[in-house]
Amino acid sequence: MMILALLFAAGFVAIAEQLKPSGTVFEQPGAEVDALLHVPAADYRKEWVLLGSFSVLADQAEKGAKQLHVVYAEPKTVDAYRNTGVFPDGAVLVKDVFAGKTEQMTTGTVSYAGPLAGRFVMVKDRAGRYDGRSPLWGDGWGWAFYEGTETRKTVTTDYRKDCLACHEPARSHDLVYVQGYPVLNR
């Protein structure tokens, strides 16, 4: 009788699992792989390597930089890239985007980092395991932008629409503007 009760309970659990309402986190397409995209918990500005930075000029150049982009990677990612010329599977790149502040100083017109506007995160998927499982993954990377100080909830909805246009000119370098990252030179 006890065995029969256990079998009945197991069957009930299996049926209940199938009837679970759609839209739960685990049933959303790509939710499990999208969880791999987030701003790292590590203090990456202190513990990771600063790859380099870019200044994005304002529409009127004399107004200086409208944004400063500062990019970081783990030391093991830098070592692997310098040894092989490719980003290893699982590599994480974090790009801080700061609003540019520009003013006159004794050295001339200077731009420097103002408030944090957000962060881009890219996670390398060399084997393409996540391609097609989520619109945030493709072309060998996971792609996400986090506004302000947000670290988990991305505003990116589809890397093809939200990210690829800016990265396409760097396709020959795995969609990364490596020319701005002198530490990667071998």
Regions found by a protein language model. Give the residues of each.
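N-terminal post-signal-peptidase region of extra-cytosolic proteins
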Residues: 67-83, 104-107
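Sec/Tat signal peptide C-region and signal peptidase I cleavage site
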Residues: 12-15, 20
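Secreted/periplasmic proteins
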Residues: 49-71
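Catalytic cores of secreted/periplasmic or lumenal enzymes
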Residues: 25-29
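Bacterial N-terminal signal peptides
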Residues: 2-11
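Sequence context surrounding c-type heme c attachment/ligation sites in exported
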Residues: 19, 23-24, 34, 41-47, ...
